[in-house]
């Protein structure tokens, strides 16, 4: 039995070695991000214990075939060197792949405050852009290097283990007596069964889920225990399940009825266009000389970065000044946490459906929005982006849905491209200004949408710009704010400026400071600033969201239009609540409460909003039923439109 147990010893040694490496990756994440911990009393050790549990699932997935092959072969007395070397190659290849999400998870979590998931596959269609982002952002280099160091050390240890056990396999063959052979097969069956049980992760009706990692009130520690490869694998499998391709939060009929009621839509429901209605503004004051419109979507500009909202560093003097001299919104929220969500919500009044990209598809989706309505009024519509036009299917989507001209990296000098996301904000805005000036000379009204991207890794700050802060992450915010101010200063000298309404907002926020709940508020709380002719200077303290931009803007412009969106004119109708998404979570909130729901976990998180704006978790879920109904209804109605009205 000696050779058999040596084979078993080899398998167990590799398994333990793999668990050790995955724990090291978790330790790196803990060291790098431990400042995110808000529950001082929560056990740190338990996160690592939970982590080994989840790591073991991945290790068992990889080990089940080698365990079966090697132990069966050893049971029959056959342990050839070639077999061991083949198994070693198997382990090296698959664990090298499994370690990748663990290495990438630290910077990913730092940016998104959630573990790496299937949403990253949306980046795979842009290999050059994605690889450029990874290689050009210096803060990622450490984790790339650690991946190669840890993986290299693992493979080196594998080779040493193989050589050690190869020598032991030179021992005389095990006795092939029937009883001993049967005994070895029984032990093999137990080990294979143990491996399969490790894949399942737990006893009971359901296999292990991410919810098993939750043990305290701290969101970072709860997620620290989840193996990134496990999270990536299960989220991808969830995407492929038929029942998860279509959201089933509540019956469609109930959701549509509720949503129409909240939006003030009356009359019979048209199943082919459930939210269609005619919006009639005051035609008596409708201007014959329609104002131009400039919409600026700022990358990751969380409200928490503004001094107006309490940031102690002087990062955004331009936005802070505009905020106090414009129509500004205090409690305004993004539809999601990705740029494509911000664009479809702001420009087309359609909410985010968790992590789906609603602009992509073999057949380009059709939407009615700001550009399509303005086109009916004779506007020329332009869209400016820093990167390639094909990114996220932008060129096809926007040209299909109301935009006449798309300006992108393909239009700019190659010498101005600074990273994988194209040109810097100031160059893009300078190019946009020159183009707008030419367009204005035609005498036709225009709409220009400018999407910035500088406040997204890799951060590139022009040499001429001299920031006041020391950290690159805050310096880039200073630069982005300056670029807006420089654009507006130069635009103010142009004849078209006085007849132009400007809309400035973020596409979404980002993590600023610590998260006091399951989802950082700073990720969706964003500024919205509107100014121009006929726009009142006031601070709007009610609730608002990106889908409200279109009806609010058209209300200010006194335009009549056919509307199919989820928004309301905030100057005429107050929202009792808002709702939004964050990849695998959906949220509803009002001024006093915040409700977060994770459909894959079927778990709710309920928070009271404290006077200082922070969140405090509460277990009194019954008090949040109206918020739950609000977000479930709106998301389910959006799901219906996405599936039945395209």
Residues of each region from the PLM?
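Transmembrane and membrane-interface helices of multi-pass
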Residues: 2-244
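Generic alpha-helical secondary structure signal
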Residues: 6, 43, 81, 118, ...
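Residues that form generic nucleotide/phosphate-binding pockets
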Residues: 55, 133, 156, 160, ...
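Short alpha-helical "patches" and their helix-cap loops
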Residues: 81-82, 243-254, 359-363, 567-568
